[in-house]
Amino acid sequence: MSEPRPVSTRRPVPDDMLGGRLKGSYLLDLELVGVDEIAPHVRLITMASSDLVGFEYTPGQDLLFEVPNGDLTLRRRYTIRRSDPAKGIADFEIEIHDGRGPATRWAAKAELDDHLEAIGPRGGISLRPTATSHLFVVDDSAMPAAFAMLEALPEDTNATVLLVTSHGARSRPAAAGGPAASFVWLDRAEVLELLSDLHPAAGTAAYLFGERHLVRSAEELLIAGGLDRDAIATKAYWRRDQPNASHGEPSYN
């Protein structure tokens, strides 16, 4: 006889919370059940909860975590890397930035049985199923979203992923499913030089995620190369010298 399925206790977010920007999301109570170092500066954190049983989301969406900061909390958004809604678990790949901020300090010291509150799912970026080719340009902060979206594509899809790394760590696990994509690791200057000479074919969909100025520059170069603006999805995860801009809410998407 199988064990009874856990019952979700997640609650809808009040319509007026954060000015109504969280409508359609849920309040979630999560427990940390797994921690693994998967690459330099990257921790894989696994959360579990009955609130995640049957939890539905679109690949690339995230949860807004209430991260402890002394006697207070602050909000940080982390992409759902993968999940098992039958078991009520979800994985998150979190960057460790040399311990400079409260969220980094929490992620670096996170331990089993830690409890956090979160809100989600969040985010409006989604794959374009009618595209004949998919181009991802992402930095370290956005790799979980790109990999999650890539794994949702059919195996016969044409996809290229340009990975912009700031600290030279090119051993991070990539997508485990989806198409046999082409992965190219670059620094910021290299990716902008490559994009300046790129002329995407008709039917290409581009997904530009990461630092705000990188996203803007990449978008301008792709448009100059002939790609229609409507074929480009953008999401700025952070701004240089401005941690937690907009309280964890992307400001350019």
Language-model region placement:
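Active-site beta-strand/loop microenvironment that shapes enzyme catalytic pockets
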Residues: 104, 108-173, 208
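Ferredoxin-reductase
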Residues: 15-109
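Short, flexible loop segments at the rims of nucleotide/cofactor-binding pockets, characterized by
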Residues: 95, 113-115, 182-188
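Short, conserved phosphate/pyrophosphate- and ester-handling motifs at nucleotide-, phospho-/glycolipid
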Residues: 60, 142, 211
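Reductase modules of NAD(P)H-dependent flavoproteins
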Residues: 163-253
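Actinobacteria-biased recognition of intrinsically disordered, low-complexity terminal regions
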Residues: 1-24, 250-253
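Short, structured patches in soluble enzyme cores that scaffold and shape functional sites
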Residues: 49, 67-69, 94-96, 120-122, ...
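Active-site catalytic pocket residues across diverse enzymes, especially alpha/beta-hydrolases
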Residues: 51, 153-154, 222-226
